[in-house]
Amino acid sequence: MKSRILVALLVVLLSGCDSKPKAPFGFEWGQTVDKTISQDLKGVKVSDKDGFIAFVSADSAPEPVQYDGKYFLSFTKGLGLTSATFSTGVDKNGYFFNQGRTIYNSIAQKLEEKYGKPKKVTEYVERDGNEFYECIKNESCGQWAREYSKDGMKIILRVESKYGSLIDDFPKGDVSVRYEYLTKEMIQKVNSVEEKKEKSNNF
């Protein structure tokens, strides 16, 4: 009887050792840049690997989504992976928010199934039709985004216009979904380490 109780307690303790939520695209919150590079992703590019914030971009993921696009990962020193974004270009063949709307709504439905109703919806434009993408270049004219939250994760789905002049036969915008996992405790941990460095005097 005692042994069964001990086993049960051990299972509970082990299950509580890693309470991080599941990260998207087959990645893991807290994983390192080196582990990410070892995952054989296509088109991997790394910048500021040894900096406070490191960045990795790739054309694939361990568990890719159904659309073609790019994956952007951010790593915080001492914490590992803290944000992951997928972005896909839309409406290459026109200036209306057509393909983009279809993909945006499809992703929104999938996010709602997994994370529940969005906590914030900001979807408005003063100029629609073939001016939609020009309008959302300026937040005072329009924005198209939804924000979700679950288990300490913040998820933002948004539509953004391409920079500069919009050109025929090129995507007019991007639909992206960004996941961030950075709790207050994690921020305090990083700040504590940085404060100790600043206070140290080894001269």
State where each predicted segment sits.
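Membrane-embedded hydrophobic alpha-helical segments
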Residues: 9-11, 111
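Residue-level detector of functional hotspots within protein domains
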Residues: 3, 57-59, 67-70, 132-134
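C-terminal motif of bacterial Sec signal peptides marking the signal peptidase cleavage site
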Residues: 13-16
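Mid-chain, structured segments of secreted extracytoplasmic proteins
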Residues: 61-105
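Non-cytosolic coordination micro-motifs
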Residues: 19-57, 89-203
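Sec-dependent signal peptide recognition
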Residues: 2-8
